[in-house]
Amino acid sequence: MPQLNTTTWPTIITPMLLALFLITQLKLLNSHLHPPTPPKFTKPKLHAKPWGPKWTKVYLPHSLPPQY
């Protein structure tokens, strides 16, 4: 039975591991290069409403009978 020739394995495996290491480092560097910006807290603008702050009509739910 012939023997498996393994003389070129270190030549192939070493650059492969180096390439995987470099790709992983570049991905990690790229993901941490720009941290997410914090959200800006702004106060909501209050617009003048012509109808005022109170309700004009109150509606009952459909499940209740009308009350007079």
Swiss-Prot record:
One of its GO terms (cellular component) is mitochondrial membrane. The gene is MT-ATP8. The modification N6-acetyllysine is found at K54, K57. It is a single-pass membrane protein. Subunit 8, of the mitochondrial membrane ATP synthase complex (F(1)F(0) ATP synthase or Complex V) that produces ATP from ADP in the presence of a proton gradient across the membrane which is generated by electron transport complexes of the respiratory chain. ATP synthase complex consist of a soluble F(1) head domain - the catalytic core - and a membrane F(1) domain - the membrane proton channel. These two domains are linked by a central stalk rotating inside the F(1) region and a stationary peripheral stalk. This is ATP synthase F(0) complex subunit 8. Belongs to the ATPase protein 8 family. The keyword Plastid does not apply.
